[in-house]
Amino acid sequence: MEVAAKLSGARLSAQKARLVADQIRGKGVEDALDILAFSTKKGAQIIKKVLESAIANAEHNEGADVDELKVKTIFVDEGVSLKRIKPRAKGRADRITKRTCHITVKVADK
């Protein structure tokens, strides 16, 4: 049994989210939640909410036991980039790219 949860358009770059995702891939959900709870990265709190959603989906929809779940797959894809302009000196402007990402977490029985 495999259950997924997805967050689209998270205001976080995919590169920074992948640093956190790599830490919990393949771990049990209890260990993964502990790692995310004590991480200082912004992406850790976002990924933690997605993981908690996947766990809740497994409990509610499939009747799974939380102690038996592990993070089977987690991947981060790039989302749309928001283009913004930052005014500079002498009438010039620089482009700022505010990146987003899509986070997918799949949990399964051990």
UniProtKB/Swiss-Prot annotation:
<dbReference type="GO" id="GO:0003735">
    <property type="term" value="F:structural constituent of ribosome"/>
</dbReference>
<dbReference type="InterPro" id="IPR047867">
    <property type="entry name" value="Ribosomal_uL22_bac/org-type"/>
</dbReference>
<dbReference type="InterPro" id="IPR036394">
    <property type="entry name" value="Ribosomal_uL22_sf"/>
</dbReference>
<dbReference type="InterPro" id="IPR001063">
    <property type="entry name" value="Ribosomal_uL22"/>
</dbReference>
<keyword id="KW-0699">rRNA-binding</keyword>
<dbReference type="InterPro" id="IPR018260">
    <property type="entry name" value="Ribosomal_uL22_CS"/>
</dbReference>
<comment type="function">
    <text>This protein binds specifically to 23S rRNA; its binding is stimulated by other ribosomal proteins, e.g. L4, L17, and L20. It is important during the early stages of 50S assembly. It makes multiple contacts with different domains of the 23S rRNA in the assembled 50S subunit and ribosome.</text>
</comment>
<comment type="subunit">
    <text>Part of the 50S ribosomal subunit.</text>
</comment>
<keyword id="KW-0689">Ribosomal protein</keyword>
<dbReference type="Pfam" id="PF00237">
    <property type="entry name" value="Ribosomal_L22"/>
</dbReference>
<protein>
    <recommendedName>
        <fullName>Large ribosomal subunit protein uL22</fullName>
    </recommendedName>
</protein>
<comment type="similarity">
    <text>Belongs to the universal ribosomal protein uL22 family.</text>
</comment>
<keyword id="KW-0694">RNA-binding</keyword>
<keyword id="KW-0687">Ribonucleoprotein</keyword>
<dbReference type="GO" id="GO:0022625">
    <property type="term" value="C:cytosolic large ribosomal subunit"/>
</dbReference>
<dbReference type="GO" id="GO:0006412">
    <property type="term" value="P:translation"/>
</dbReference>
<comment type="function">
    <text>The globular domain of the protein is located near the polypeptide exit tunnel on the outside of the subunit, while an extended beta-hairpin is found that lines the wall of the exit tunnel in the center of the 70S ribosome.</text>
</comment>
<dbReference type="InterPro" id="IPR005727">
    <property type="entry name" value="Ribosomal_uL22_bac/chlpt-type"/>
</dbReference>
<dbReference type="GO" id="GO:0019843">
    <property type="term" value="F:rRNA binding"/>
</dbReference>
